[in-house]
Each structure stands twice: as structure tokens, then as C-alpha cells.
UniProtKB/Swiss-Prot annotation:
The chain crosses the membrane at residues 12-32, 52-72, 82-102, 204-224. Residues 33-51, 103-203 are extracellular. InterPro entries: CD63_LEL, Tetraspanin/Peripherin, Tetraspanin_animals, Tetraspanin_CS, Tetraspanin_EC2_sf. Residues 1-11, 73-81, 225-238 are cytoplasmic. It comes from the Eukaryota. It comes from Oryctolagus cuniculus (Rabbit). This is CD63 antigen.
Length: 238
């Protein structure tokens, strides 16, 4: 009876963890989509290991949701094969997450280098490509920045002059405010450094969330193994 009661408790906790997995899966997908939206506006000339990380995060989130469904079915039916599959897949997800975290750390400088290069390339097309102009204007407004390194980068761009920057560089945006501007009326800091700082701040949040998800996954594997052992021993835990 004590063993049966303990397994009932394990089964209940596993249900709770499965709900947590679903929440984690949705969170991973949201983070991946958000990161992809940011990178899609900046890194456009070929894929790098760093720029592929959002795709990996989204894939892991979707797979985790599927694994949680398998675990729910296995727990409900007390199916040995499903629970073994659940534990194995959950372990694989942990390995992928660890690999993604390592790749993110290793290629962090590469991502910023690609961002800097592509930002400067897009600046060259500012006057001839409306879509590029819209993207750069939105970034400069959102991150209160101007140019790649600073506002003087615009002086060498075709269609610009030394006394002109895009209106999106202005603190208070009005039509033509970037022509013959006063330095005190525009953002002078570059977008590469500003966005890099924003990314570094958010990496800490993502890292903390990843640790929490990993802890939940370890508990899920442990409880799944306990239930598998119970099923194999022939205990009834309904």
C-alpha cells in the first residue's frame, strides 16, 4: 500500500510537470519567434550558426510540446513503451538545449559581427530600397540610436550629406528634422552597440529560464523512470 501510495503521488507530480512542460514549450516558441523577428531585420545575407539559434529554439519548443503529449498519454494509460519513449525524448531535448546554449555562447561575437556588417550594408541601400529604409528607421526609433557606430556613419551613405541623417535619428521625429540637424536634437549613439547591449541583457533572462526548464526536465525524467519501474513491477497506481 505504501508503494502504491507513493506511485500515486509520483503520477500526480508527473501530471503537474507535464503541464509545466507545455508552458515551457510555449515559452520557448515565443522566445524563438521573438529572436527570429529581431535577427530577420538585421542578418539577411546568409545563415550563421548564431542566426540559426532561434530556429533551433522554436524546434525544441515544438518538440517539447509533442513529448509532453506523449508523456501525458503514457502516464494516463500507464503504458511502459510510451513512458520509456517520453524519458528518452526528454533526455534528447536536454542535450539539444545544452548544445544550443553552448553554441549561443561560442558564436555570440560572430552574431554581432554579422549584425554590424549587415547593418552597414543596409545603410548603403537606404536611399534606394524602401523596405530597407523602413527596417532601419524602425530600429533607430525603437533603440533610440543613429547609424552603426554613431550618427556620423550616415555622412558616407549615398543620398546623404555631412549635415543630414534620416528623420528617424531625431529625438522628436518631424518631417525633415534630419536635414541640417543640431547634434543635441538627434540620437548620437550607434545601433550596433545599443542592440548588442539589449541582447546581452536579455541573454541573462533566457539563461535563467533555461536553467529552470532544465531543472523541470530532470524532475520529469526522474518521475518517468519511477513510474516505468512501477509499471514494470506490476503495481497498480490508478
Amino acid at each position: 500500500m505504501a508503494v502504491e501510495g507513493g506511485m500515486k503521488c509520483v503520477k500526480f507530480l508527473l501530471y503537474v510537470l507535464l503541464l509545466a512542460f507545455c508552458a515551457c514549450a510555449v515559452g520557448l516558441i515565443a522566445v524563438g519567434v521573438g529572436a527570429q523577428l529581431v535577427l530577420s531585420q538585421t542578418i539577411t545575407h546568409g545563415a550563421t550558426p548564431g542566426s540559426l539559434l532561434p530556429v533551433v529554439i522554436i524546434a525544441v519548443g515544438a518538440f517539447l510540446f509533442l513529448v509532453a503529449f506523449v508523456g501525458c498519454c503514457g502516464t494516463c494509460k500507464e503504458n511502459y513503451c510510451l513512458m520509456i519513449t517520453f524519458a528518452i525524448f526528454l533526455s534528447l531535448i536536454m542535450l539539444v538545449e545544452v548544445a544550443a546554449a553552448i553554441a549561443g555562447y561560442v558564436f555570440r561575437d560572430k552574431v554581432m559581427s554579422e549584425f554590424n556588417k549587415d547593418f552597414r550594408q543596409q545603410m548603403q541601400n537606404y536611399s534606394t530600397d524602401n523596405q530597407t529604409a523602413l527596417i532601419l528607421d524602425r530600429m533607430q526609433k525603437d533603440f533610440t540610436c543613429c547609424g552603426a557606430a554613431n550618427y556620423t556613419d550616415w555622412a558616407t551613405i549615398p543620398g546623404m550629406t555631412r549635415d543630414r541623417v534620416p528623420d528617424s535619428c531625431c529625438v522628436n521625429v518631424t518631417s525633415g528634422c534630419g536635414v541640417k540637424f543640431n547634434v543635441k536634437d538627434i540620437y548620437v549613439e550607434g545601433c550596433v552597440e545599443k542592440i548588442g547591449l539589449w541582447l546581452r541583457k536579455n541573454v541573462l533572462v533566457v539563461a535563467a529560464a533555461a536553467l529552470g526548464i532544465a531543472f523541470v526536465e530532470v524532475l520529469g525524467i526522474v518521475f518517468a523512470c519511477c513510474l516505468v519501474k512501477s509499471i514494470r513491477s506490476g503495481y497498480e497506481v490508478m
